[in-house]
Amino acid sequence: MGPLGFVAVGVGAAAGAWLRWGFSVLWNAINPAMPYGTLAANLLGGYLIGLAVGFFDTHAGLPPEWRLLAITGFLGGLTTFSTFSSEVVANLIAGDYGWAAMHLLLHLGGSLLLTALGLWTYRMLA
């Protein structure tokens, strides 16, 4: 990866992280046991990566820096596996096993479902 690739990843990651932070500021306090901002970031990221994979698979001639910007950078910065993990562990430590299970179901199941939906959406529109 050349210098432009590093810039693409960095710019994309900053933008994705800022959006994730904005979601957290707006929605996490609504229900501390299920921080909705983190959930929104992961579900949106899952959907968008499905769209992006479909797009880049059908536009293979684009410079690789665009994929680095969008997928590795932006969506990597937006989605929050480490935050999600710490929230599940916090639920477990607090004895909130139902909320921990709900986190797992919604984040993992929802993200997988929305990634498939994003890819399907792109293929239907292409």
From Swiss-Prot:
Pfam families in alphabetical order: CRCB
GO molecular function, one term: fluoride channel activity
Described function: Fluoride-specific ion channel. Important for reducing fluoride concentration in the cell, thus reducing its toxicity.
Family per record: Belongs to the fluoride channel Fluc/FEX (TC 1.A.43) family.
One Gene Ontology cellular component: plasma membrane
Reactions that this protein is recorded to catalyse: fluoride(in) = fluoride(out)
PANTHER family in the cross-refs: FLUORIDE EXPORT PROTEIN 1-RELATED (PTHR28259:SF1)
Spans traversing the lipid bilayer: 6-26, 36-56, 69-89, 99-119
UniProt: Na(+) binding residues: 76, 79
Main subcellular localisation: membrane
Membrane-related topology note: Multi-pass membrane protein
Notes on activation and inhibition: Na(+) is not transported, but it plays an essential structural role and its presence is essential for fluoride channel function.
Cell compartments where the protein resides: Cell inner membrane
Keywords: Cell inner membrane, Cell membrane, Ion channel, Ion transport, Membrane, Metal-binding, Sodium, Transmembrane, Transmembrane helix, Transport
Tagged with keyword Ribonucleoprotein: no
InterPro entries: FluC
NCBIfam families: crcB (TIGR00494), PRK14196.1 (NF010792)
GO BP, sorted A to Z: cellular detoxification of fluoride
Protein name: Fluoride-specific ion channel FluC
